[in-house]
Every structure is written in C-alpha cells, then in structure tokens.
UniProtKB/Swiss-Prot annotation:
GO terms for molecular function: rRNA binding; structural constituent of ribosome. InterPro entries: Ribosomal_Su5_D2-typ_SF (IPR020568), Ribosomal_uS5 (IPR000851), Ribosomal_uS5_bac-type (IPR005712), Ribosomal_uS5_C (IPR005324), Ribosomal_uS5_N (IPR013810), Ribosomal_uS5_N_CS (IPR018192), Ribsml_uS5_D2-typ_fold_subgr (IPR014721). Part of the 30S ribosomal subunit. Contacts proteins S4 and S8. Residues 15-78 form the S5 DRBM domain. The keyword RNA-binding applies. With S4 and S12 plays an important role in translational accuracy. Located at the back of the 30S subunit body where it stabilizes the conformation of the head with respect to the body. One of its GO terms (biological process) is translation. Keywords: Ribonucleoprotein, Ribosomal protein, RNA-binding, rRNA-binding. This is Small ribosomal subunit protein uS5. The gene is rpsE. It comes from the Bacteria.
Length: 171
C-alpha cells in the first residue's frame, strides 16, 4: 500500500496550497464547550489545475491536512488563454453570483475578497476583472468561482461543439 502511495505522489504535479479560512465550531454540552475546527483550502498548479475542499477535525492541523488531501483528489482543469480567461462568464452557487471578465496583460487580478483572489492566483489567471454579487461567504464565493471557471470553453471547443472549423491565421 505504501509503494502505491509513493508512486502516486511522484506523478502528482507540484501543487501550491493555501488555507482560505479556518473556523472554530463550538458545541455546548453539559460539561462545558467542545471545540472543533473546519478548514477551507485551495490547491492549484498555476497552470490550469485547481481544487478546493473543506474538512473538520478536533485540531487545526488535522483539519487542514484532511482538507488538503480531499482538495488534491478533486482537481479540475480550467482553460486559460495566456494570462487571462477566454471569455466573460458568470458563476452561481446558492445566493452568490460571481462575474469574471478577461483583462489585458498587466491588469492583474481585480477581485474583492481573499477567497476569489486565492483561487484565481492558484489556477494561474493573472489578468482578470471580477465582481461578486449576493452572498460573500468564503465557501459560497469559491463554489461560484469554480462554477464560472468550469463553464469556460476555448475557441476550439466551441467550434467543435458547433461543428465548424476555425480559419488558421496566416503569418
């Protein structure tokens, strides 16, 4: 079993990990208060792969470790054109709405809030304009951003879906 895990880790891409939020949960019982912690983490390779997860544990370190393991198992590929996204998109989750718009090189990430900025940095998008509407809780924003990013399509994918061919640029 250990040999399989080591082999899997060798093939895994170099992922950057960031903790977005740690929350303390209190359960009041007869003898006092019991504390647990939940961690929200994002992992990405800055080349188009991104994943996020939440986990709970009695210790902060354990919660982060569990969340990182879950996030690495849930990686998805996002199409990126240069340093930005191919087209405008809106991601929705619950009461959150997240608008993403491509920006010219050098603009940077124009995003309010730590959650959205973190996920865009780790996916490898450096130039994008964003706006969050509705609920601004970290998990809702991250899920809305992921919804928007997963709805992105490249020109080639759209052409294939429509059954047309793209004209090649002559240089």
């Amino acid at each position: 079993m250990k040999a399989i895990k080591k082999e899997f880790n060798k093939k895994a891409p170099l992922l950057e990990e960031k903790v977005v939020k740690i929350n303390r949960i209190t359960k009041v019982v007869k003898g006092g208060a019991r504390f647990r912690f939940s961690a929200l983490v994002v992992v990405g390779d800055k080349k188009g792969q991104i994943g996020f997860a939440t986990a709970k544990a009695k210790e902060i370190v354990e919660a982060i470790k569990k969340a990182l393991e879950k996030a690495k198992k849930q990686l998805v590929r996002i199409p990126i054109t240069g340093t930005t996204i191919p087209h405008d998109t809106i991601g929705r989750f619950g009461a959150s709405k997240f608008f993403l718009k491509p920006a010219s090189k050098g603009t940077g990430i124009v995003a309010g809030g730590k959650a959205a900025r973190t996920i865009l940095e780790l996916v490898g998008i450096n130039d994008v304009l964003t706006k969050t509407f509705g609920s601004r809780t970290s998990i809702n924003v991250i899920r809305a951003v992921m919804d928007g990013l997963q709805s992105l399509r490249t020109k080639e994918e759209v052409a294939k879906l429509r059954g047309i061919t793209l004209a090649k640029k002559e240089q």
